[in-house]
């Protein structure tokens, strides 16, 4: 580079030293606004959480600069000695955390981790079974709008109408009839325990693989507050955020070496190129946090808080699907109140309580309307809420929903404003990122 073509030193210095606020004030303002929202609203979306400052720091590190196609010790690029350290730490910690023999920490998302299992084990057109989305399953478990439902033949099992629980005898009978190559246990809105042992017995009986997608309850498994699927499933997948409280991403676990080459090859080069090394570094940090004794207390508190919230709502006349919860989430059936999920979600958001509309089993409403709300406790538990606070949250939710049930337009501005002030007072007692 000649002297005339070189950038002035001041320009280079600015590139490496300018703060985000200096370099891009518009994005800085959006981030500041989101921080304010998280600080002053009660987060009840079951799939969200609040990560540690250490996880944020790892994810915002210079690891973002590095391409590292391949796996530790077998990369397609040079200069990977330090990202190898980070990925090996993530792998070792994941295996220790969940008691698995093998782990792949490279999936960029929950969808991609499940796609990798399909790619590794199935051929297009093969039959598999998963919980119906309307009964609490997930898009990647065979929804007709998802790749899993377009490329493969999905046979969905569901829940009973009377108690909204999975009927394992019905699952066994269906498996006998459809002879799936894969059975998936796991979902996004099922609040009761999964019988992993029985699922494996059914899978073995019909010659199917068992995949457990524990994306929602992995943090509870890690903390000993939920049964582990690892001893029973052929393959276990999970996201690394949600109740596990790490960065957004995926993880695949298995015990039998016969799956190693298939699964690793399905992720790279099958679905992904260069892994996101800054995210993998953050995953390693989160796994280390989950290995500490205090994480067991956190997981136990999530479940206790969920039970307290569900009971608080039940005591105030709200119907909880299946009658309660044994994990971190619950579904509120709004039909007895004459409410819809979309209207209720918006009213609660205006009052400073973030949640999401959700279909309930056998819901007559469309997915963007719904008859229910999904509520979860991981994020507010992270910031320190306990049983007493969640009982109060239940009362605040009831206050808003009862008010809008009496309002022709689905809004109650005075009540929403009053509840928002109470929410602000509550969240101020439990600050984040100070």
UniProtKB/Swiss-Prot annotation:
CDD domains in the record: SHMT
Source organism, top-level taxon: Bacteria
Annotated GO MF terms: glycine hydroxymethyltransferase activity; pyridoxal phosphate binding
Keywords: Amino-acid biosynthesis, Cytoplasm, One-carbon metabolism, Pyridoxal phosphate, Transferase
Name of one Pfam family that matches: SHMT
Gene3D superfamilies reported for this sequence: Aspartate Aminotransferase, domain 1 (3.90.1150.10), Type I PLP-dependent aspartate aminotransferase-like (Major domain) (3.40.640.10)
Annotated residues for binding of (6S)-5,6,7,8-tetrahydrofolate: 133, 137-139
Sequence positions bearing N6-(pyridoxal phosphate)lysine: 242
SUPFAM superfamilies listed in its UniProt record: PLP-dependent transferases (SSF53383)
Localisation per UniProt entry: Cytoplasm
Subunit details: Homodimer.
Sequence similarity: Belongs to the SHMT family.
The protein's name: Serine hydroxymethyltransferase
């Amino acid at each position: 580079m000649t002297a005339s073509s070189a950038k002035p030193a001041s320009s280079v210095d600015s590139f490496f030293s300018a703060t985000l606020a200096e370099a891009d004030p518009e994005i800085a303002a959006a981030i500041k606004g989101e921080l304010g929202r998280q600080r002053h609203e009660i987060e009840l979306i079951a799939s969200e959480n609040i990560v540690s400052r250490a996880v944020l720091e790892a994810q915002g590190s210079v690891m973002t600069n590095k391409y590292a196609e391949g796996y530790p010790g077998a990369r397609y690029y040079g200069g990977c000695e330090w990202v190898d350290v980070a990925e090996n730490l993530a792998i070792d910690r994941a295996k220790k955390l969940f008691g698995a023999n093998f782990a792949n920490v490279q999936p960029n998302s929950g969808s991609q981790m499940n796609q990798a299992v399909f790619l590794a084990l199935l051929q297009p057109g093969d039959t598999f079974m998963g919980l119906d989305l309307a009964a609490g399953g997930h898009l990647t478990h065979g929804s007709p709008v998802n790749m899993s439902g377009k490329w493969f033949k999905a046979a969905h099992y569901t829940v009973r109408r009377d108690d909204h629980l999975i009927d394992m005898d019905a699952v066994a009978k269906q498996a006998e009839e459809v002879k799936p190559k894969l059975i998936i246990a796991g979902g996004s809105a099922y609040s009761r325990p999964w019988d992993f042992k029985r699922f494996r017995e059914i899978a073995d009986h019909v010659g199917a693989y068992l995949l457990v997608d524990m994306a929602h309850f992995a943090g509870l498994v890690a903390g000993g507050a939920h049964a582990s699927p690892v001893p029973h499933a052929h393959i276990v997948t999970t996201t690394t955020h949600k109740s596990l409280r790490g960065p957004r991403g995926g993880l695949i676990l298995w015990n039998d070496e016969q799956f190693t080459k298939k699964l690793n090859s399905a992720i790279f080069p099958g679905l992904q190129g260069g892994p996101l090394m800054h995210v993998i570094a953050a995953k390693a940090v989160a796994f280390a946090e989950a290995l500490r004794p205090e994480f067991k207390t956190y997981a136990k508190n999530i479940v206790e808080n969920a039970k307290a919230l569900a009971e608080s709502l039940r005591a105030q006349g709200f119907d909880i699907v299946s009658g309660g919860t044994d994990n971190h989430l619950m579904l509120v059936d709004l039909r007895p109140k004459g409410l819809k999920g979309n209207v209720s979600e918006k009213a609660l958001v205006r009052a400073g309580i973030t949640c999401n509309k959700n279909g309930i089993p056998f819901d007559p409403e469309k997915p963007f309307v719904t008859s229910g709300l999904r509520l979860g406790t991981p994020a507010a538990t992270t910031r320190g809420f306990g049983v007493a606070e969640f009982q109060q949250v239940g009362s605040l939710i009831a206050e808003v929903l009862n008010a809008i049930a009496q309002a022709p337009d689905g809004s109650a501005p005075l009540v929403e404003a009053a509840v928002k002030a109470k929410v602000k007072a509550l969240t101020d007692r439990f600050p984040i990122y100070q």
